[in-house]
A protein has these predicted regions:
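Interface amphipathic segments
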Residues: 1-167
Length: 167
């Protein structure tokens, strides 16, 4: 038996068009998923690792207006439109340990959609460590460092060049 994380129930009604190749606990999924929280496209290998009792994954994902805030259960975060390569494990924000390299066309945060974001970093134990470049009309930023989401408020340890910030 494989337990489905509670946050995946937030997907609501799901329509997947694509193919699964492999076994129930080790497969490649490629196709498109429409759900109550948005659209995802994936070409990803997903394995259930019984030692860690979680999923291990590697591949390419893209999304269109996908409500990552609802799935990750982060109130200030909204929808994301992105294309990224990911290599990691864990499907819950609390347990994810993944490397992410991608381009984020749009990311909602505190009721504003930031655009043109490049990300290259790792997410583990509610901690982001990496580089972020933002070329948004309201934010021009080069960021390198850490953001710790473990507490009520994020804790930052970083170096940044901020050319424009109209927040």
């Amino acid at each position: 038996t494989i337990d489905v994380p509670e946050n995946l129930e937030d997907l609501g009604l799901v329509d997947f068009k694509g193919k699964f190749t492999g076994f129930f606990s080790d497969f490649v999924a490629y196709g498109n998923l429409n759900s109550d929280v948005g659209y995802l496209s994936a070409d990803i290998n997903l394995k259930y690792d019984s030692r860690i009792k979680d999923y291990v994954y590697k591949g390419h994902v893209s999304s269109n207006h996908f409500d990552i805030g609802k799935i990750a259960r982060i109130g200030d975060m909204g929808q994301v439109t992105l294309a990224a390569d990911i290599d990691g494990k864990g499907l819950r924000f609390e347990t994810v340990d993944a490397r992410l390299i991608g381009n984020i066309q749009s990311l909602g945060f505190k009721n504003y959609a930031y655009s043109n974001i490049k990300v290259n970093g790792e997410i583990a134990k509610k901690l982001f460590n990496g580089k972020v470049n933002v070329q948004d009309p309201n934010l021009d930023l080069d960021f390198e460092g850490k953001i710790n989401f473990q507490g009520k408020l994020p804790i930052f340890d970083f170096t940044a060049a901020i050319k424009r910030a109209h927040l």
